[in-house]
Amino acid sequence: MDKETFAEFAVKSTIETTLQEALDIIDADDGKSWEEKRAALIQHLQSHKEPVLVDALADLAVADTMGQQNRNKFWSYGEIFCPDSNLLLRDVVEADRESYMAMQKEYSIMKSMLNEEAYCTMVWNEHLDPKALMLTIEKAGTYVGYCGIKRTVEKPWEIAIELLPQWTNHGIGSVAIPAMMSAIRDRLGESEFRVRIDPGNLASQKLFDKLGAVPNGISEFLIHDQDALEQCEAEHLDQIDDHLIAISNKFNVEPRKLLSHVLEYKLVCR
């Protein structure tokens, strides 16, 4: 198994099943209004044993006032331009959708679901979620990816970043992330952030090490069922190598735990 899929393996099957059930409810030609479908969806999800997944899917249909206020206040100060690198950080617009979805087809653990238009719409709407603060990254007018905060209603704020494959290894993250954090600190008063990275994603680990992030333990990735996590670990013990052992020492955890968990970093904007 590719090391970048350690944590992903533990969640893929459960997510696929639950999302398909959700899409069946939404797409049903039963004459019900969206509000009735939403109520049915939430009722169905409440019976699911993964509370984090339940919250994530149910929240897609819920506008959060506090998150929208954070977003409005942030953008009231305008866009962020980084002249030395010719990068622009701006609000997400509908015209970004095609490039954003192309990026999801490269990186998503749910690639098969991206053939479903309803799922694509769900993914795009999540990117626009009022509880998130997402910044499109442009270089010389060209879409290269995004960075942002996944949920501004939960602290510490968790940083997210994805770049189109052709724009990785160009130093964009090392410029965009500090620029975003400085703007958030100055505009919204938040200076402490959370970063979660798959143990196999060496590029992201190097980026955030360079930015001054410090190890802060490990965390589960969507799936919290202990039996499923332990099964994933037991089935892939042969994937433990010197690299994984070195990371486990750095984060002070058992190597096998990195087969089912992601790395936690703490990053403070000074």
Region spans (language model):
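Amphipathic, non-membrane alpha-helical rod segments
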Residues: K37-L41
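A short gly/proline-enriched turn/hairpin at secondary-structure junctions
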Residues: Q104, S108-E117
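N-terminal acidic leader/helix
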Residues: F6-T18, A22
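Charged, low-complexity interaction regions
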Residues: D24-E36, S47-V54
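Active-site rim helix/loop that mediates acceptor-substrate recognition in acyltransferases
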Residues: L114-L135
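A short local loop/turn or secondary-structure capping micro-motif enriched for an aromatic residue
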Residues: I109-M110, C120, V153-K155
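Acyl-donor (CoA/ACP) binding surface of acyl/acetyltransferases
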Residues: D2-E8, Q43-E98, K105, E138-R270
